[in-house]
A protein has these predicted regions:
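Short alpha-helix capping/helix-loop boundary micro-motifs
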Residues: 62-67
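Short, surface-exposed secondary-structure edge patches
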Residues: 32, 68-69
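Hot-dog-fold acyl-thioester-processing enzymes
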Residues: 1-61
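HotDog/MaoC-like acyl-thioester-processing domains
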Residues: 71-76, 80-123
Length: 123
C-alpha cells in the first residue's frame, strides 16, 4: 500500500478528511500517521479476490463491512475468501448467485477489513 496511492484515491473520491493525507494533522491523532482511506481498502481487497472468486461475475452488493484494524502506507495487504452459499438465480435462468466472505489481512496477519459479497455468475 503506497502513500501516493492512498492520497490519490482519497482526493479522487473527494474525501477531504485530513486523517488520510495530512501527516501533521494525523500526528495529533491516536494513530500518529495518516490512515489509508477505508473505501480504498475495500476496493483493493475486493480486487484481490476477483481472480479467484468472481473474474467473470457481476457484483450484486456488499454487506457486513467491518474495519477492525487500521491500514497505513507501507502495509502489505492480502485477501482470503470463503464461499458461504450458492444457489441458482430465481430471476435469471442460467445464472447462479454466490455469497462469499472476504477478509483482508496485513503483513502481521491482522484482519484489517472483512465483508460479505454477493456475485452473479453464469452457470
Amino acid at each position: 500500500m503506497l502513500e501516493a496511492d492512498n492520497v490519490w484515491f482519497t482526493l479522487l473520491t473527494m474525501n477531504t478528511n485530513p486523517i488520510h493525507f495530512d501527516a501533521e494533522y494525523a500526528a495529533g491523532t491516536e494513530w500518529k500517521k495518516p490512515l489509508v482511506d477505508s473505501t480504498f481498502t475495500l476496493a483493493l481487497v475486493t480486487g484481490l479476490s476477483v481472480q479467484d472468486v468472481s473474474e467473470h461475475g457481476v457484483n450484486l452488493g456488499w454487506k457486513e463491512v467491518r474495519l477492525p484494524a487500521p491500514v497505513f502506507a507501507g502495509d502489505t495487504i492480502r485477501a482470503e475468501t470463503e464461499v458461504l452459499a450458492k444457489r441458482e438465480s430465481q430471476s435469471r435462468p442460467g445464472f447462479g448467485i454466490v455469497t462469499v466472505r472476504t477478509r483482508g489481512l496485513n503483513q502481521r496477519d491482522e484482519v484489517v477489513i472483512e465483508f460479505e459479497r454477493s456475485i452473479m455468475l453464469e452457470l
